[in-house]
From Swiss-Prot:
Keyword Transferase in record: yes
Pathway(s) it belongs to: Cofactor biosynthesis; adenosylcobalamin biosynthesis; cob(II)yrinate a,c-diamide from sirohydrochlorin (anaerobic route): step 6/10
Official protein name in the record: Cobalt-precorrin-5B C(1)-methyltransferase
Enzyme class: transferase
The family this protein is said to belong to: Belongs to the CbiD family.
InterPro entries, alphabetized: CbiD, CbiD_sf
Pfam entry (one): CbiD
GO MF term set: cobalt-precorrin-5B C1-methyltransferase activity
Keywords, alphabetical: Cobalamin biosynthesis, Methyltransferase, S-adenosyl-L-methionine, Transferase
Length: 388
């Protein structure tokens, strides 16, 4: 095998928070907006007056920091009040940007708070999400934020309230997320750990990858399949049709986090299905594969070319390739089928090492156009439905 490279996860550079020199705006999570709406409705219920502004405290690392929100709509009725706060996700491409987080607060005879879901908020149907099956998909931190915000608005120890959080259009939004696969049906999740949406949701995506692994483990699964996007996931599902949908995880750039979590949760076998670019970076030991944080090591691809029996001239062309795809096209044109196999073997070895040797890992490379396997680590294809 070519010379070993150190396994690493490059840090996120400052450029990830800037676009063309402009600092990107952070935004607010659905949890923060739900807490703000709940507090506005509670204050309206207690005072009998509609609210125009509301202030809430952020959790976690932002604890102590208070932020103000305008109230989009506030209505009162007999024994109830309802308020709406519109989510601003900042410069993050978030499907819930512009969502109307709505809270209806009504009196109840018993002290304390009853928190429930309304239209557009999902319900948990599978274990492994940190919430009971059958519970509203309102995560623990947002739940605490809502309760704390209510305590600031009224004394629920003397007279209790029922709070219903809803998001009009939330069910449609949820179809664009991983919620259906994770077992959250009927709408979006109310999320957030810091109360803040950071640009590009890198932290949120990493957290969702970890959560997806947890769901596989909670359902007694042993096998997980990582892909980098919709196309490679489609290829993976064709290769492994016997696995349940929950086993397939779009890992994006967070392969390292996924395999470490899988090892920690006691899973046994993992597959990585990808194209040349991501595989080339993983073969170099780079576990965080975003293009701004790492470049393809064409010298490694040249070494693999030689190892696979390619000519020195071909190796030099591969080393000068402008992308991993270009290198693969050079291999394909030369009929060097052994090179993708060696690349996948290197990836599987690196992933096993990154998991501390606790996982049986396999890697499969698919063609950019046909999505059919063009290389795999030893024994990988024998475990699939591929009979090409």
């Amino acid at each position: 095998m070519p010379e070993r490279r150190e396994l690493r996860e490059p840090p996120m550079p400052p450029s990830m928070a800037r676009v063309r020199g402009r600092k990107l705006r952070t935004g607010w999570t659905t949890g923060t907006c739900a807490a703000a709406a709940a507090k506005a409705a509670a204050r309206a219920l207690a005072s009998g007056e509609a609210q125009e502004m509301v202030e809430v405290r952020l959790p976690g690392r932002g604890e102590g920091r208070r932020v103000r929100f305008g109230v989009e709509r506030c209505e009162l009725g007999e024994g109830w009040a309802e308020a709406v706060v519109v989510k601003d996700a900042g410069d993050d491409p978030d499907v819930t940007h512009g969502a109307h987080l709505t809270a209806r607060v009504s009196w109840r005879e018993e002290p304390g708070v009853e928190l429930d879901r309304g239209e557009g908020v999902g319900v948990v149907t599978k274990p492994g999400l940190g919430l009971p099956v059958g519970a509203p998909a309102i995560n623990p931190v947002p739940r605490r934020m809502i309760l704390y915000s209510l305590e600031e608005a009224l004394d629920t120890r003397r007279r209790g309230v029922r709070v219903v959080i809803s998001v009009p259009g939330g069910e449609e939004m949820a179809r664009k997320t991983t919620n259906p696969r994770l077992g959250i049906v009927g709408g979006i999740s109310i999320l957030g750990t810091t109360g803040i949406v950071r640009p590009f949701s890198t932290a949120a995506w990493a957290a969702s990858v970890v959560q997806a692994i947890d769901v596989v483990a909670a359902q007694g699964g042993d096998t997980f399949v990582l892909s980098t996007g919709g196309l490679t996931e489609r290829a993976a599902m064709r290769l492994l049709p016997h696995l349940e949908e929950v086993c397939f995880i779009e890992v994006g750039d967070f392969t390292g986090q996924a395999v470490r979590r899988a090892a920690k949760r006691g899973l046994g076998r993992g597959f990585f299905v990808g194209m040349a670019g991501k595989l080339a970076k993983l073969a170099s030991g780079v576990m965080m594969t975003h293009w701004t944080r790492s470049r393809v090591d064409t010298s490694l691809l040249a070494e693999i070319t030689r190892k696979a029996g390619g000519s020195e001239r071909l190796a030099e062309e591969v080393e000068g390739a402008n992308s991993a795809r270009h290198a693969y096209e050079l291999w394909r044109a030369a009929g060097l089928s052994g090179a993708p196999r060696l690349l996948c073997a290197r990836v599987a070895e690196n992933l096993r090492e990154h998991a501390g040797g606790a996982l049986e890992m396999h890697a499969i490379m698919v063609d950019f156009d046909t999505l059919e396997p063009v290389g795999a680590s030893p024994g990988a294809l024998e475990l699939t439905a591929w009979r090409g």
